[in-house]
């Protein structure tokens, strides 16, 4: 057994590319070794901006032999009456590269056939691995890649060296102009000389560590966090928690060194979000806060190179930030010379989307949709504030501050609203209507912000789809998936029992002046189908797919209600008796489907002949009222528990009663009984879509 070590050295790879490339290297090498029939131990990848490396411990010295069996024509066709091979047999043998005498007879599900067994002898690992590693590096995918001027090989950035060692012995691997060797390189400035490697992961990590490179992201993260903690104390505070920035800086440096800097206290008069945004988004600096979480006029920058005189580095960092904050202060002071209401008309000169008009049109439609949603929820008292918040929601797009810091849209509008003395609820709504930004981001704080947020996303979703634009598997330039997910998250989190179909219709009303690419009904169905697709995708990440399909088939117009039904059904499925219940109700639903909804009659007790059907009616009458009450309260766990008490009676009914009797009156009466049973659960879930079996003892019984 020997360790395989493979490293790709390159010019600085963008930080966002590195984690995905490391995951791909690890996954692809594991799969490639398995496909190559090379046994191995741990596979792990490590990397920095200048190198991507992966190793496999304890690689077998040789492939295992591959045994394959190919089946040919039936024996009756392969040999004639005298037992001599026919052209069919000789042709099959020739296609397999063997003599006809090597054919054997084998029993298959399709009868006795001729077959040939071939054994491919395993090759030595050093013969197999070079080509395998060349495919590995060539298969790495990046959002953007560069091509050498001398060949067609591509990579995130120009490849400068490669290392490929098996048990310390070099393998010849080529990518473009670069051929692998057995030396790597340390820190670009602190240890640029070649470093000979023994080929083991431990040797690799240790030698690079001495050369000022922490190749292992786990070790580098710990060092980075320690440096940030040290610098925070030096700055008489602590570094503001920012996991996303930590992750980014982690792949910007090979050896982190924190430097504490300072900026003018007067800049603390700016909104904290402005200062933080400038530091983190533009300079990759960490903000420093005091014990109460208030921003201090200090920052921490992380250098990739430890310098002899930190004061020189500090001065450089401070100089860059000082200029940026001066610009921010200028924009802030200029913006405040005009009130938000004075900027509303400016939105008419800003295009939202060519076919949907201006940002002013958009704001007016958002207000109309938000008001309609509020009335549908019985929140009429919010309408006046909703119209005001909608008018002002996009106004800050025309401010100098948002022009310079686009990520602060909404945030700056809220700050300006508070400074002007507008209602705090309206200021919060201006900020919150952009939330959630991502799948795990925080949600709007109030109904006001939530309804403007939903209306904004509905307008985008219905409007963009309405004018003929679509999200494809490869691209979503208008953020339609993000809009749909945002709608669903807000509606579910706030428990809004909204009709999605009605909400789409209300949005189409607001878009009445827009020329649609298809008929109104077609657009509405396209939007609802898109929303259902997002619901399905989101819920199947947590719940069994069959349960999701069952619930959606029973209705998803009210997603809050559908989610409650799904959670109740998932809890019920975890119980040991669920299989019998699901099978019984599936039979009920199947009979209803076969009957096509016709032929059923109101149940006449006088026509009940068998004890099993009489017992079922009695059991039904005991639970129907309770189910109606529980369902009205949306207490779906209780509904399912109550309905489950019918399972024994339903099972006995199917065992002893012929539903589709020849007598039309009996058949109609029994179908009516099935219809009443189905009515108890048909609007909860379509049990026909649930994958479940009755317990073995129940089937045997």
UniProtKB/Swiss-Prot annotation:
The listed locations are: Cytoplasm
In the record, the note on similarity to other proteins reads:
Belongs to the class-II aminoacyl-tRNA synthetase family.
Q: What is its EC number?
A: 6.1.1.14
Source taxonomy:
Bacteria, Pseudomonadati, Myxococcota, Myxococcia, Myxococcales
What cellular component GO annotations does this protein have?
Answer: cytosol
- What name does the UniProt record give this protein? Glycine--tRNA ligase beta subunit
UniProt key word Plastid? no
Q: Cite the Pfam families for this sequence.
A: DALR_1 (PF05746), tRNA_synt_2f (PF02092)
Reading the lineage from the top rank, the first entry is: Bacteria
Q: Which UniProt keywords apply?
A: Aminoacyl-tRNA synthetase, ATP-binding, Cytoplasm, Ligase, Nucleotide-binding, Protein biosynthesis
Which SUPFAM superfamilies does this one have? HD-domain/PDEase-like
Give the molecular function GO annotations.
arginine-tRNA ligase activity; ATP binding; glycine-tRNA ligase activity
Q: Which GO terms describe its biological process?
A: arginyl-tRNA aminoacylation; glycyl-tRNA aminoacylation
UniProt-listed InterPro entries: DALR_anticod-bd, Gly-tRNA-synth_bsu, Gly-tRNA-synth_heterodimer
Q: Enumerate the HAMAP family for this protein.
A: Gly_tRNA_synth_beta (MF_00255)
Quote the subunit structure annotation: Tetramer of two alpha and two beta subunits.
SMART domains for this protein: DALR_1
Give the catalysed reaction(s), semicolon-separated: tRNA(Gly) + glycine + ATP = glycyl-tRNA(Gly) + AMP + diphosphate
Give the organism, scientific name. Answer: Anaeromyxobacter dehalogenans (strain 2CP-1 / ATCC BAA-258)
